[in-house]
Amino acid sequence: RLEVLGCCLATVHAACSWLMGRACRYLAAWALPQFLLVTQGDLPLLKMETDRLGVLVSGTFPEPAATPPELPPTLLSHQEHQLCQQIRSTAASVQLFSGDVLKMFSTDCKRMSAEIFDQTMPLGKHWRVGLRADLPSSPSAYAAAAAQAVLGQVLQGAQLLPRDAQAPALARVTTAFLEAWMDHILAQRIKFR
């Protein structure tokens, strides 16, 4: 039993460490297609499997306090008990990371969008109608650059995901992008006339 628990812990811990490390590395490198594949493709599978492992461990090696009074408690060695606790802890870490990863993604998308808007969005007089003879017929260069750098990469990565996994990432990035744009407009006090 000890060997099986040890193998289970080593496997789930290695998979969890690899996935979390890759996700953070891809996001830091702004490699959004890879980030989305890992977090929206691989992470749900890891979460499902760690949940199943947690249920199996809890069913096979219940906590002494969780054992019904009519059943004799399973005697666990100290090492078995520690391994079970570590498996449950790793499963809980996967759960937490799964809940936090889109927030982390959204925050970085908003930061990246804000940087692009700060660097490229025209200010002041550019937006006054009197300086232009006609309305624009194509997107502004700043808008195209920001959309390609943020939204374009997410769309590229989302295409590789199953349909049901695309919506959360697309919703988060669109919201973050528009919030950054609105924050920039308000901070710079840009008036459209």
Predicted regions and their residues:
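Extended alpha-helical rod/solenoid/coiled-coil scaffold segments used as assembly/tethering elements
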Residues: 1-193
